[in-house]
Structure formats: structure tokens, C-alpha cells
């Protein structure tokens, strides 16, 4: 085992041109780990706090020099000398050093950067790929991509209310073919939109962001694109939605679809999702209701939880306390996993473990503000969760993760597994 001899943070840019933090950890063996931290656009109120400088004269107040300084001046002296492979102890030390329930003192971005860089340095020292270091010999499941090919909501400047329309290539035999199928549908969608005189500009995550007459029209153009690419909707490729309903939820306790000019109650939202699920091959809905609409979520789960993956993102924020509440209430049946929602690798792995034990699925996810860092590709294989959400097959910040997964599948060889429809192991298919 090797101990930490240096920790250094710097300010870099993310995919939206905003500053974020990158951390390097060096061990006495000479091994170095580097990690960059992502940032979200639609963020849950209960996420760990991302520390920003607030100096309007610099990066419009979004600089992260305070977080950088916290790593270099506060966290580094505390961790230098610790063994890099003691991940749980290192993460615990940073949580205690921060001392707040939401990491607001040092910043979840500062803490996460160090947490991930430590893991990468430890893997490097052992000569192991990160997925194998984190997951051991049983890390072998490649994920089904949940690929965002049409954007609305906060991820785009258009009149579409639902934030993400995604495709999932469940009929593929392996990850390599799954990626090909998604890419072909993505290009097919571009042609379909062109033929209708619609925009093919892209949103934060690489998906197209046209103005459409309704949210349902978005589903229809995607189904047309799937068929024109030569695939069968519902067999080869299924659909997933992320309404990001918290963003629609207003003080009147109702959901405002501003693009369509429609206001819905919780009950009407559930009926809306039921109608879409009955008409289209939709297998997953993320944040179908707001993060504090627990009673609505319970009803949604009772009505759709046996046949659709109901994913809690803002609802659970990768937090074991909120996930535990959801499990006890019978709310949702899946959790979205975002490293920066909770702020350490250890707590992220704890959330995945809790979900699995309760029979919930888990989906490892990017954020809308990404970097070239590919940690989540290794994490999804390490944990065998079988699903990843990391944008369209466009923009290098998204494609970097897919390319890393191609490398991992190649390295695993005949051991690699692709779950396909079995990724949804807790719903009737």
C-alpha cells in the first residue's frame, strides 16, 4: 500500500463553459490519480452543495477558487500520509472535516474531486483498471445506454416541457452493437427533423432541441426515427422519459407545462403518464413527479410501478436517508446515481448497495455540465447496475464515456455481459 504525498486542485472548464474543479492525488509510489467534477442544470433541493465563489466580476460568479483553496489548504494537509486504498476512511475524514450535513463548508465539488482522484491513484498503483479496482473480479456487466436524443426543459432553449426523451437499445447483443444502434437512430432523427423543417441544434447533452407542437410529438418523431433506422420500437429499442417534474412544480401545488400551456394536478400527471405508457413503448420515467410530492409518488408507484421503471433523481439525490424513506413508503422502484449529488465515492456506493438490497434498479448518470472525465463509465461496470445515462452520441464530453465503455467491453472479452431487457429486473416486461 502507498500513502498520499500530495493533493492539488485547479480550476478548469466544463462542457457549458463554466468553471469546475479538477484534483490530482500523488502517492509515494509515484502513482497519480486525476478527477474532474461535473455540475447539474436542474438540481434537486436536497443535493450536496456545490461551492461557487459568487464573485460576479469573475466567471459571472461561478468560479470555484474557494473550492480549489479548500482542497489545497484544508483537505490536503488532513489526508497527506493516509493510505490511498483506505477509501472509506479517507471519505469519512473529509465528511468530518466539513462537518455539515450537505458539505456546504468545504463544498461537495471539492470533496468529490479528492475522493475520485484518490480511487484513481490507488487503482493506478495496483496496475488495475478503475472498474476492476472498485468492483473486483465480478465487475463484468456493461450497461444498457439510456441515450438522450431529444432535449427540452432546462437542457434546451425550446418549447418542449419534458426535459429528456431517451432511447434504450434493449435488443442489442452487446454494448458495442447497442452504441451503433443508438448512433444510427440519432442520425435518423436528424434526418426526420430536417424533413419536417425542424431545428437540429443540440442541447446541453447533445440531443436535438426542436420546437414541437406537443411533448407527444417528440415521442412520435423518435419512433419514426427508430423505424427509419431499421429497428422495431418496443423490441429492439424502447423509450425512457425524464420530465424533471420538480422544475414544472409551482407554488400552487400544480405542474405547469408552459410549452403546451397546460396545468396538471398530481392525479392528472399520473393519468398523463399512464396514457403515454399505454400508447408507446415507454419503460422508464424519471422524476415523473416533484421531489417533495411524496403522496403523489406513492400513488404513481401503485399505479405504474409493476410495469414501468420509476426513477427517483431529485427525489432521492443519491442520498441513503431519502432512499430509505422511499423504500419504506413504497415510493419509486429505481434510483438515479449522480456522484456529485452526494459528494463522495463511498456514499455513492452505499446508495447503490441499498437500492440493490431493496430490489430497486440503479442507473449511473452524468450531469448536464460534464468534462472529459470518464469515471462514471468505470463505476457503472464496477457496480454491475446495468444502466447508464450519459447523453447523446455527440459532444466529446458525452462520447468520452461511451468510448471508455467500448474499451472496457473489449478488455473483458468473453466475460463481458450485456443485460438488454434484463436491466429492468424488477418490472414485468
From Swiss-Prot:
InterPro entries: Enolase, Enolase-like_C_sf, Enolase-like_N, Enolase_C, Enolase_CS, Enolase_N. GO terms for molecular function: magnesium ion binding; phosphopyruvate hydratase activity. GO terms for cellular component: cell surface; extracellular region; phosphopyruvate hydratase complex. Mg(2+) binds at residues 242, 286, 313. It is found in: Cytoplasm; Secreted; Cell surface. It catalyses: (2R)-2-phosphoglycerate = phosphoenolpyruvate + H2O. Pathway: Carbohydrate degradation; glycolysis; pyruvate from D-glyceraldehyde 3-phosphate: step 4/5. One of its GO terms (biological process) is glycolytic process. It holds the Pfam family Enolase_C. Its EC number is 4.2.1.11. The keyword Magnesium applies. It is an enzyme of class 4 (lyase). Its main location: cytoplasm. Its cofactor is Mg(2+). Gene3D superfamilies: Enolase-like C-terminal domain, Enolase-like, N-terminal domain. (2R)-2-phosphoglycerate binds at residues 163, 338, 367-368, 389. Binds a second Mg(2+) ion via substrate during catalysis. Belongs to the enolase family. HAMAP family: Enolase. NCBIfam families: eno (TIGR01060). This is Enolase. It comes from Caldanaerobacter subterraneus subsp. tengcongensis (strain DSM 15242 / JCM 11007 / NBRC 100824 / MB4) (Thermoanaerobacter tengcongensis).
Amino acid at each position: 500500500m502507498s500513502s498520499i504525498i500530495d493533493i492539488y486542485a485547479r480550476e478548469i472548464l466544463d462542457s457549458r463553459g463554466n468553471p469546475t474543479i479538477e484534483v490530482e492525488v500523488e502517492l509515494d509510489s509515484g502513482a497519480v490519480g486525476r478527477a474532474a467534477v461535473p455540475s447539474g442544470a436542474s438540481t434537486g433541493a436536497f443535493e450536496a452543495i456545490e461551492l461557487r465563489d459568487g464573485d460576479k466580476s469573475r466567471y459571472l460568479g461561478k468560479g470555484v477558487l474557494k473550492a480549489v483553496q479548500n482542497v489545497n489548504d484544508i483537505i490536503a494537509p488532513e489526508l497527506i500520509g493516509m493510505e490511498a486504498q483506505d477509501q472509506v476512511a479517507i471519505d469519512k475524514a473529509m465528511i468530518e472535516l466539513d462537518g455539515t450535513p450537505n458539505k456546504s463548508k468545504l463544498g461537495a465539488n471539492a470533496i468529490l474531486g479528492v475522493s475520485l482522484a484518490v480511487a484513481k491513484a490507488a487503482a493506478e498503483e495496483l496496475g488495475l483498471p478503475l472498474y476492476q479496482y472498485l468492483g473486483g473480479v465480478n465487475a463484468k456487466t456493461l450497461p444498457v445506454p439510456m441515450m438522450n436524443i431529444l432535449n427540452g426543459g432546462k437542457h434546451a432553449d425550446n418549447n418542449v416541457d419534458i426535459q429528456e426523451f431517451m432511447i434504450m437499445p434493449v435488443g442489442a447483443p452487446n454494448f458495442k452493437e447497442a452504441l451503433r444502434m443508438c448512433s444510427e437512430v440519432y442520425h435518423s432523427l436528424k434526418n426526420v427533423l430536417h424533413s419536417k423543417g425542424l431545428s437540429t441544434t443540440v442541447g446541453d447533452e447533445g440531443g436535438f432541441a426542436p420546437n414541437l407542437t406537443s411533448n407527444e410529438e417528440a415521442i412520435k418523431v423518435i419512433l419514426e426515427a427508430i423505424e427509419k433506422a431499421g429497428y422495431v420500437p418496443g423490441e429492439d429499442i424502447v423509450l425512457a422519459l425524464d420530465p424533471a417534474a420538480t422544475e414544472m412544480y409551482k407554488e400552487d401545488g400544480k405542474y405547469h407545462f408552459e410549452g403546451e400551456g397546460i396545468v396538471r394536478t398530481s392525479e392528472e400527471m399520473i393519468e398523463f403518464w399512464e396514457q403515454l405508457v399505454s400508447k408507446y413503448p415507454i419503460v422508464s420515467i424519471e422524476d415523473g413527479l416533484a421531489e417533495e410530492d411524496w403522496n403523489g409518488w406513492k400513488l404513481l408507484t401503485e399505479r405504474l410501478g409493476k410495469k414501468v421503471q420509476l426513477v427517483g433523481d431529485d427525489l432521492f439525490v443519491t442520498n441513503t436517508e431519502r432512499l430509505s424513506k422511499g423504500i419504506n413508503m413504497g415510493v419509486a422502484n429505481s434510483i438515479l446515481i449522480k456522484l456529485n449529488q452526494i459528494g463522495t465515492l463511498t456514499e455513492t456506493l452505499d446508495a447503490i448497495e441499498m437500492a440493490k438490497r431493496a430490489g430497486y434498479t440503479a442507473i449511473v448518470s452524468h450531469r448536464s455540465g460534464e468534462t472529459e472525465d470518464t469515471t462514471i463509465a468505470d463505476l457503472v461496470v464496477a457496480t454491475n447496475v446495468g444502466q447508464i445515462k450519459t447523453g447523446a452520441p455527440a459532444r466529446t464530453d458525452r462520447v468520452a464515456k461511451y468510448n471508455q465503455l467500448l474499451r472496457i467491453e473489449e478488455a473483458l472479452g468473453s466475460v463481458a455481459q450485456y443485460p438488454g431487457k434484463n436491466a429492468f429486473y424488477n418490472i414485468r416486461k
